[in-house]
Amino acid sequence: MNYSDKYEVLWATPIRTATRSCKPIQKYFEFDVIGEHGFQIPKGKEEYFFVLNTRNPYTRMISIYHLFCVHYKLIPNNFNNWIRKKLYEEIKFPGYTLDYEYFIKKRITKTPDLLIRVESLYSDILKLPFFMDNSDELFDIVNDNILKNAYSSGYNYKEYYDQDLANYVYSYLEEDFVYFNYNKDSWKNGTP
């Protein structure tokens, strides 16, 4: 987990939650990088303001599918089969890849002070406690990186999900939906 002693902030960026967009901001503020996707709170930093990036679980599953399958040319027969297999594996090895709310409850007893949602990345980043105290230069850094790595679901949920698969994903990741306040039926309108 990345942190800043100067601002007393911890910032966790789980896999597929805009890490590339947030890293230059962390660099600008001279955060120490302990692990891009790690959840371990460094000793003595337990009381720091805790920022956590999050993403709609439906979109996150599609993004992970593309990361692990398409990018590495390990394309299974289809998303439906792949996600069912991965979620089943998650039962055997909890917290491995898909269910990151698990990490928070099992490894971190601290509730996030600020959620940065991938779907509202720009406006949420502006809520960082140290943001308003800094120069306009930061606006350029945020704009450049958010635009460069712009969140675009780029995915039409209806191409990936039907009611049966959405129910299946929700049944495994219900705690993520509830904890991070994402709508169970968000896949129905096609995009998050």
PLM-predicted stretches and their roles:
Residues M1-P192:
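Membrane-interface amphipathic segments in extracytoplasmic regions
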